[in-house]
From Swiss-Prot:
It comes from the Viruses. Keywords: DNA replication, DNA-binding, Early protein. It comes from Orgyia pseudotsugata multicapsid polyhedrosis virus (OpMNPV). NCBIfam families: pcna (TIGR00590). Sliding clamp subunit. Responsible for tethering the catalytic subunit of DNA polymerase to DNA during high-speed replication. The keyword Membrane does not apply. Residues 60-79 bind DNA. The keyword DNA-binding applies. GO terms for molecular function: DNA binding; DNA polymerase processivity factor activity. GO terms for biological process: leading strand elongation; regulation of DNA replication. Belongs to the PCNA family. InterPro entries: DNA_clamp_sf, Pr_cel_nuc_antig, Pr_cel_nuc_antig_C, Pr_cel_nuc_antig_CS, Pr_cel_nuc_antig_N. This is Probable DNA polymerase sliding clamp.
Amino acid sequence: MEATFATAAAFQSIVGALRGLLTHATFDCDAHGMRLHSLDVERVALADLRLRRAGFARYACERKLSFSVPVRGLVKIVRTADPSAPLTMRVAARDDRVRLAYETARRAVSCTLAQISLDADRLGVPDKEYTCVLAVPSAELTRACADLARLGATTVEMSSGTTGLSFAAHADDGVRVRVLLRGSPQRPLTQAFACCYLNKLARASALSETVDVCMDASMPLRLRFRLGPLGALDLYLAPRVPSVGESAQ
């Protein structure tokens, strides 16, 4: 498999979004593109990244293959690349290393990253339509989640309704806070989530100007970041049922 990103910046943003959530990344490759499908260590959040063949500057994959790498190592390599330079990833079926390379007018750099062996989870993702889908500015979602974390909230109630999307939580020192992100009217629905995980997922906001916040009483929260012709990143978070005395009632 050989995949060339038109600019390293595209892959840098994707890897940066996953850095605080995943310890390892498992990629599945075929003739149509690449897919990352990995759970976090605590099995609370799921990342589902789909990169289409048409979105790469060059892509070739003659046979299906899968490989897993440590996210920290991938971050270290990708960060060294010139953001404007093309970045190429190569993986061979019988090679235990992933090869990444980029070059500019003045230098050429190649690195390898050892693959890791693990029993990768292949969990399904919801395939039915969500009842509530709100498109909100990514930066505002990040700011709301970061503010709640700074105030000391542990559990956050997210609610959709006639005015948009709201966040409510009890925080440290008797503080109660509510943040409203205005949007199109939606069916009333409230779910509770761990603030620390919401904050991690919202950090992917650098990927796109807007994010689709998808809620349904019978499914996990989904944050969908669209990557233009390259594809999309879906981040899923299981709801939490707060116990008595926790921050959101």
